[in-house]
Amino acid sequence: MTNLIKNVKDAFNSVLSYAPTHILQAPGRVNLIGEHTDYNDGFVLPCAINYQTVVAAAKRDDNIVRVVSVDYGNETDEFDITQEITFQENKMWSNYIRGVVKCLIGRGYEFKGADISVSGNVPQGAGLSSSAALEVVIGQTFKELYNLDISQAEIALNGQQAENEFVGCNCGIMDQMISAEGNENHAMLLDCRSLETTAVSMPEDMSVVIINSNKKRGLVDSEYNTRREQCEEAARIFGVKALRDVTIEEFNAKAHELDEMVAKRARHVITENDRTEEAAKVLASGDMKRMAVLMAESHASMRDDFEITVSEVDTLVDIVKNVIGAEGGVRMTGGGFGGCIVALVPPMLVDEVKAAVEELYEAKTGLKESIYVCQATNGAGLVL
């Protein structure tokens, strides 16, 4: 993060010609287990990772917000918070910032302008929530600059609202919530219905290894919508609000009445919820052998019942599994059809995992992976 801090400070100084008063950060995240459970009112178990979006900021006396994007060649954006805040077709990055500010005002918070420079190293397009980190760090910035009486949960909800309503991208609450509320060496069990969060301690020094298959993700939107409709249909047949309310026993008793495809989708969600709740318990007790089993079962369920993995991702999981055995867990993470796998790896096996993936993955698939070795880190806050 030191480089990011230097970059935002330098950009602030050179473009705005004075020094910032505050440095803030918000992290990206990875979901350890609990896939496609969020929109079924279920449970997820993400952790924040030490790839961040960092902001240098200072208050202004007027109502202007000026933003410098270091990652877009110090491109700037400027808007007046007393005027209508509008969507910018030609500066997509600035819409996340405009949206967050607009939603804060809409929620009744009062503040004046700010000068902001921003840079991040959360890999984009890898499903590690670079957009949520940006939304959360901007909310955090106005909280700190103006001592706003806003909770971390509300900063997260405000970011989600900005993405849904202003940017126009439909997302659940997980990404913003873990970015706002993460804890070092902890994952977070999030109940997507009540939004209740529980910090879950992780074995000390456990590496969180994220490997991007770099398989271009096709069909994501249409397939995602189909899965969602199938889950809603299953919930209707069971007469419940969401699949969260169906036990595996209830499912087994009625599965024969469901369309075969709908039954497979529902079985994934119902068993994944059970796995996620159990994973929170076994992770906290340091039982990595059981965690390994749960992550393997999660992957198999995504592959066979939810049918969202692809051969490249399955190959990556197998390569890592062969190295770590029962010492750690590995599975696909994210929406599916490409994207990343996540592995919990004891530190002494990290180099071996990297070597195996580098030797075998490209040879088997023709694609070159990207590897990120992370630790579970703190959520958003002041750095300086």
UniProtKB/Swiss-Prot annotation:
Biological process per Gene Ontology, one example term: galactose metabolic process
Example GO molecular function: ATP binding
Entry's localization field: Cytoplasm
Keywords: ATP-binding, Carbohydrate metabolism, Cytoplasm, Galactose metabolism, Kinase, Magnesium, Metal-binding, Nucleotide-binding, Transferase
Major location (coarse): cytoplasm
Top-tier EC class: transferase
Superkingdom: Bacteria
Sites annotated Transition state stabilizer: 29
InterPro entries named among the record's database cross-references: Galactokinase, Galactokinase_bac, Galactokinase_CS, GalKase_N, GHMP_kinase_C_dom, GHMP_kinase_C_sf, GHMP_kinase_N_dom, GHMP_knse_ATP-bd_CS
Positions of the catalytic residues: 175
Cited function: Catalyzes the transfer of the gamma-phosphate of ATP to D-galactose to form alpha-D-galactose-1-phosphate (Gal-1-P).
Family: Belongs to the GHMP kinase family. GalK subfamily.
Protein name: Galactokinase
Gene symbol of the encoding locus: galK
